[in-house]
Design a protein with these regions (language model features):
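N-terminal targeting signals for export/organelle localization
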Residues: 248-328, 466
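Short, internal strand/loop/helix patches
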Residues: 401-437, 441
Length: 466
């Protein structure tokens, strides 16, 4: 029995020892107050401090628990001294030496390879810069054009050979360090294909090319890659390209990559959450329901979707997937500033801007002030072709009546949804106000939730300001 207990105790000791990290950091010729170990956090998009110690020329960073896989930076005060990958709970005992711009790892093969790769990348870049300089010299000289073209063709061939060497080198690294986070990083850095000639001078075609290629080398299989700034940077670049593309081009490409992420559920949820924050958040400058709604619909079809996420996505979809362009706005009763009681559909107008607001909301007030200065808006109202209807939809009647006497624009119509049906019946998404809907004579939506800075261009496009 004692032997068995001793054996179990020994096993526990071994497991405990294997779960620790022990990183010796030696820095030569540098002074600071503190040395910190920082790990990248994908959700917060920044490095978070894991450990802080007083600075010394030699410091041992250690802990009883192993470091989570990810990308780490060691900083002396605010100066980054070294970066490294952690791939698993093993091999967390190594040494880093830093002097001037030189660094060296002992006991960590993948991080030694990381440093070597950076050095080789500089070599490749320097060789390409030589070709750039040669090209500049060719452009300056007075040789006949056919001779210049021959020389340029030679430079292009040499550049392709260099890029081919780099590609082969990186693929060899991927194979040699297969299974490590470093290998996934190398995969993400593989050279993207050159854009076709048709993309030059055509921004729309170039964006389509980028949307098709930016995530081509993304390591969807490796959830550890999320704990690196490289993942966030790639996804941020992709998000901006998608945002500025036409909807019919953007949506299928966005959904295709979200399907690709399904090979790893952790990746899927993290990447979806990131795009949801960008395209679905009420405060995001990249908010776009035309992208967000298809995302939600596709995720609700994912067979392994977590119950909590399913409930949230269904609620979100029920809130925003209505009053879309081409839909007829739902009717609701209103008390007008004149004392009449009408419904929205009873107000005749060739075009109407329905302005949902709270009179005391600071942003609502700011937008109203900006609208006062809009020449095309004022001309369209004066022509009789456009009516602006402000709608208060909350319960404080006295607040609305003060607004009528103190702040209301006499050129607008003003109404209160006195039955509060807008909110109780969930007719509109009024979580962020002001919220403006531009509709035609049938109350059919032309623009949903239109930003104020898009008002004047739309009025001009419709020819209402003449």
């Amino acid at each position: 029995m004692k032997k068995l207990l001793f054996f179990c105790f020994s096993i526990l000791c071994v497991i405990s020892a294997s779960a620790q990290y022990n990183i010796t950091v030696k820095i030569y010729g540098f002074k600071a107050d503190t040395l910190s170990l920082n790990r990248f956090d994908f959700e917060k998009n920044k490095f978070l401090v894991q450990q802080n110690l007083p600075y010394a020329d030699e410091v041992i960073l250690k802990g009883k628990k192993s470091l989570a896989p990810g990308y780490y930076v060691i900083s002396a005060d605010s100066m980054d001294m070294a970066a490294f990958f952690i791939s698993d709970e093993k091999n967390q005992k190594f040494q880093i030496e830093v002097w001037n711009d030189m660094k060296q790892f002992s006991g960590s093969e993948e991080n030694s390879a990381f440093l070597s790769m950076k050095a080789r990348e500089k070599e490749f870049d320097n060789r390409l810069k030589v070709l750039d300089n040669e090209f500049a010299e060719i452009q300056k000289n007075s040789l006949p054009q056919y001779m210049k073209q021959t020389m340029v063709d030679s430079l292009v061939a040499r550049a392709k050979r260099i890029m081919g060497e780099k590609e082969n080198y990186m693929r060899e690294l991927m194979e040699r360090y297969d299974g490590t986070l470093f290998a996934s990083y190398v995969q993400s850095q593989l050279q993207l294909p050159e854009p076709p000639q048709s993309c030059y001078g055509n921004r729309d075609l170039y964006n389509i090319f980028l949307a098709d290629t930016l995530l081509a080398n993304y390591p969807w299989h490796d959830e550890r890659f999320l704990a690196t700034p490289f993942a966030h940077n790639i996804l941020a670049d992709y998000m901006k390209v998608i945002f500025y593309m036409p909807q019919n081009e953007a949506v299928p490409r966005l959904l295709k990559n979200l399907r690709a992420a399904q090979v790893n559920e952790t990746q899927l949820y993290a990447v979806f959450d990131y795009f949801e924050k960008m395209f679905g958040s009420l405060t995001s400058p990249y908010r776009d329901e035309k992208l967000y709604i298809p995302m939600l619909k596709q995720m609700l079809e994912y067979k392994n979707l977590e119950t909590g996420r399913k409930a949230r996505y269904e609620f979100e979809l029920s809130t925003i997937d209505k009053n879309n362009e081409g839909d007829i706005l739902p009717d609701f009763p209103m008390l007008m500033s004149t004392g009449e009681t009408l419904s929205l559909h009873q107000v005749p107008a060739e075009y109407m801007l329905v302005y949902f607001q709270n009179p005391d909301c600071p942003t609502c007030s700011q937008v109203r002030e900006k609208m006062k200065t809009m020449t095309h808006l004022k001309n369209a109202i004066a022509s009789g072709r456009l009516k602006v209807l402000t709608v208060y939809f909350e319960s404080d009647e006295s607040l609305w009546r003060r607004y009528l006497t103190q702040k209301a624009n006499p050129d607008y119509l003003h109404a209160w949804n006195y039955t509060l049906s807008i909110e109780t019946d969930n007719l509109y998404d009024t979580r962020v106000i002001p919220m403006m809907m531009f509709v035609d004579k049938d109350k059919k939506v032309i623009r949903k939730d239109i930003p104020y800075n898009d008002l004047e261009p739309l009025i001009q496009k419709l020819g209402l300001s003449k």
